[in-house]
Design a protein with these regions (language model features):
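N-terminal, charge-rich interaction modules
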Residues: 1-52
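Short, flexible, solvent-exposed loop/turn segments with mixed acidic/basic and small polar residues
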Residues: 1-2, 57-63, 88-90
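Helix-rich interaction surfaces within compact, conserved domain-sized segments
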Residues: 6, 17-20, 75, 80-120
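Short, low-complexity, polar/charged sequence segments that are solvent-exposed and flexible
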Residues: 26-30, 51-55, 89-92, 117-120
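Glycine-rich loops and low-complexity Gly/Arg-rich segments
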Residues: 31-35, 56-61, 94-98
């Protein structure tokens, strides 16, 4: 997967909670990348910086969601457990939609992952 652990974030407000999340990830040497709406059609593997993935240059109309979502890329099980525990320990509202980047979903775009997570 990714060489350096990375968390993709969607629809986070520029507030104190987001600042605390960024600070925690930085302390743990995990990168944080906010994904913007125009990038929602890009393959998750591309957004995570995986080799072999290219930017989707085709035109897409529509497609958006407004809920927060996290995609953890290249985190060890221990890193992901500690990250999720951080929300509880700090009393932060949890993120309902979260996933690990996998060999299957790395080919999906953010909208497809969102739809799959909403179904679960």
């Amino acid at each position: 997967m990714t060489e350096k652990p990375l968390v993709l974030g969607y629809n986070f407000k520029p507030d104190e909670r987001t600042r605390l999340i960024r600070r925690y990830l930085n302390k743990e040497k995990i990168s944080f990348r906010m994904v913007e709406v125009p990038e929602f059609w890009q393959p998750l593997g591309y957004l995570a910086g995986l080799s072999g993935f290219q930017k989707d240059t085709s035109f897409h109309l529509g497609g958006n969601f407004f809920e927060e979502m996290l995609v953890m890329c290249g985190l060890s099980p221990d890193q992901s457990d500690r990250f999720l525990r951080f929300f509880r320990e700090e009393g932060l509202d949890p993120v309902a939609l979260k996933a690990m980047l996998t060999p299957v979903n790395q080919h999906w775009n953010s909208l497809k992952l969102y739809e799959e997570l909403k179904r679960e």
